Amino acid sequence: MMNQLPVKAIVLLLVIVGFNILFGIDGVALLDPDEPVYAETAKEMIRFNEYLSPRIYNEYWYDKPPIFYWLLVGSLKLFGGFSELAARLPASLMAIGAVLMTTVSAARQFSARAGFWSGLVMGTTVMIMYMGKASVTDTTLLFFMTGALLCFMHEKYWLMYLFCGFAVMTKGPIGVVFPGAIVFLYLLVTRNLGRMLRMHVIPGLILVAAVGMPWYVFMYQNHGMDFIYEFIGFHNISRFSAPLHPNRVHWWFYLPVIILGLFPWTGVLLKSIKDAVTKSVGRESTRLLFLQIWWIFVFIFFSIAKTKQVSYMLVLLPALSMIIGWNIERMTCENGKCQTGWVIGTFVMYLLMGVGWIVGGRQMPELAMGGMILGVATLVLGALNLLALKKYCNVESAAWLHVVTGLVTMVMAFGVLMPQIQDRFSVKTIAATYMAAEKDASRVLYVDRFLRPGFMLYTDIPGIEADVNSEKSLDAVKQDPRQKYIVMREHMYEKMKEKMGGENWELLENKSGICIYRSR
């Protein structure tokens, strides 16, 4: 098959992937704490008419460069103000763009069928389904970093540097460090460092700086060392050397992230990685080697880093998707041959996920029925996959059943399950309750640090931050002689109520574990 994807194939791909990513983005409140942070910052850019220095709670802060905020600002203005749809649409479109780039690149590097399947794999994973619906920076970084690395594969070096510059403007130095390290390791392993002479490295880095540096210079000139200490020190260096979440500091943390995040394709992942080494030849094997270095570097780097975030694994998704897509296309040429590795992997993963949905749903009463339905559907689809792979040895049928599994999982998760439990993970409802209630205007308001971005987003009231994990912070709340309210999570109140003088507080409202308390 020619390496040019037919228009019909691209349209079909965009319909499937677009549905998987866009469905339900306006049906669930923004989830605390990460999503509200970005939407609120964009709101404040508009409110203060200042688009270079980000603010939150009406004060400057130095968490991320501005590109994602600008995308949010454009979306909020387009839709006439804040809504869940306006806040999530930019991240969703960047995710779809990254899938499309991966598809086109794989088609040109391998074959049209390999490209088509690479896009379907990437676009129907649990990871892209979830992250593509989240109003956070990660899919924007994914778009630019994927663009940079794929441009290297296609020897489009000037475009590669341009993508790196935009990646730096999305999430900082990692935008050029990661592509640079992956490319260098690949050239080193293939003993082709001489290729760097054709890559215009020095002028290319100047282009990266021309795109990425002006904002940093502006921020330093206007905010001085506060910007350097917080952005470079805390949000970049410190996150590598010190854990943001101490309970996640395990070398194996990202293994379950990949296993669950690549579902429903996890069952064919190990086989594809192995086959890319043992069953590829010529230029194909060299291209696959680059993809192997890509995902291995990302996995090892973040496994070493002290701060662990699920979203960090998103950057390796294009590489693994292209490897799987290549292998699906290769295996379709072997129809009639039993793919034992895929059979075993599918049996294990579908069984685990099916049982997991059923058992997990029972942990929350509102999810019991939905979890049961999704669990049974997963087990049935797993059985059909085994039938296609084991009895009929039909690779393409099995692959399409995987696509169906991804879509069914997404529709159930975001059409049924998440709307039922959103109040457990979003302050939106309790914020509306606070705004509607009769309040004593003389009382001050404290807000749980975890909930504060969302509370500000949905009320425009910043409140006073209470770090409910800090005894010192809660003691300050206790010592404040004024009458007060505090919005915090129920389980944190029960854990820390002695530190904040629990006998002096009474519960006003409790919405799925997020509460308003009032001092007596």
Summary of predicted features, one role per range:
Residues 2, 158, 272-520:
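Membrane-embedded architecture of ER/inner-membrane glycosylation machinery
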Residues 1-338, 360, 456, 505, ...:
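Membrane-integral, polyisoprenol-dependent glycosyltransferases
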